[in-house]
Amino acid sequence: MSWLSKLMPSGIRTENTPAKKRSVPEGLWEKCSNCGSALYGPELEENLEVCPKCDHHMAIRARARLNSLFDPDTATTEIAAQLGPVDALKFKDQKRYGERIKASQKASGEYDALIAMRGTLKGNPLVAAAFDFAFMGGSMGSVVGERFARAAEVALEVGCPFVCFSASGGARMQEGLFSLMQMAKTSAALGRLREAGLPYISVLTHPTTGGVSASFAMLGDINIAEPHALIGFAGPRVIEQTVRETLPEGFQRSEFLLDHGAIDQICDRHQLRDRIAELTAMMMRQPHPQDADAA
């Protein structure tokens, strides 16, 4: 330290005095994956992870999704929350499956990729489930299938509609056939709901692929998709390499699927709550829904 620096007040810097680095809290700013805009984290969260600049629907966590659906300040009950995955096959690729489970649980704060809850939507009972893509890409293993089936059973017991928000890369390869059998298990659970005359609404979000798209995600009485969501069994690059042809622009996006009759409608995330409330009330032959706090 020079003699001049010793005489200078602490708040004044000379040209050669290094500036102190200011620490920015992690997650305070996020970058839109579509337009590249820098977005203030708390405001983005309040906007349901939709970019205010370009309206791009970014990934949203499962609990945030469900909290935005159910009536505020009302009790919700989580279904099969105690279930956690096990490495029954002692599977190992670059890492052991058990290590991947622990890492995903630590990173996401969840035991597995599907959260299911029972609550009310504008005063009417509802069971809903949502995928958390932050847990191993929302892959479907035994716990996901069991939670989905139990959620359908709760809807059957209560006599209410069931809604599922899908965001998944498909079946979890580390569980082998245990994962693939969940396709049949979840489809059978929906069959029991159908026999009881209870509606099931499937909401397909980005991305919905693999075994999830080939089972319960496309079995809704009404299939709704968020804008520009990737929906399909195999990805477009895999299909192009297989058929050796260039795919049409927008292939497998929700708008393409709507134009070709594969889904029923596209709904902005901000309007999903009202849309689901209207549809479930109509299908259950209930009065037009009103907000719980306005009733």
UniProtKB/Swiss-Prot annotation:
Listed name of the protein: Acetyl-coenzyme A carboxylase carboxyl transferase subunit beta
Catalytic activity: N(6)-carboxybiotinyl-L-lysyl-[protein] + acetyl-CoA = N(6)-biotinyl-L-lysyl-[protein] + malonyl-CoA
Main function: Component of the acetyl coenzyme A carboxylase (ACC) complex. Biotin carboxylase (BC) catalyzes the carboxylation of biotin on its carrier protein (BCCP) and then the CO(2) group is transferred by the transcarboxylase to acetyl-CoA to form malonyl-CoA.
PROSITE patterns, per the entry: COA_CT_NTER (PS50980)
Cofactors required: Zn(2+)
Binding site for Zn(2+): 32, 35, 51, 54
EC code(s) of this entry: 2.1.3.15
Zinc finger (C4-type): 32-54
Keyword field: ATP-binding, Cytoplasm, Fatty acid biosynthesis, Fatty acid metabolism, Lipid biosynthesis, Lipid metabolism, Metal-binding, Nucleotide-binding, Transferase, Zinc, Zinc-finger
Cell compartments where the protein resides: Cytoplasm
Pfam families according to UniProt: Carboxyl_trans (PF01039), Zn_ribbon_ACC (PF17848)
Gene name per UniProt: accD
Residues that span the membrane, as ranges: none
GO cellular component terms given for this protein: acetate CoA-transferase complex
Co-factor note (free text): Binds 1 zinc ion per subunit.
Pathway: Lipid metabolism; malonyl-CoA biosynthesis; malonyl-CoA from acetyl-CoA: step 1/1
Family assignment from sequence similarity: Belongs to the AccD/PCCB family.
Region (Disordered): 1-20
Subunit structure, as described in the record: Acetyl-CoA carboxylase is a heterohexamer composed of biotin carboxyl carrier protein (AccB), biotin carboxylase (AccC) and two subunits each of ACCase subunit alpha (AccA) and ACCase subunit beta (AccD).
A molecular-function term among this protein's GO annotations: ATP binding
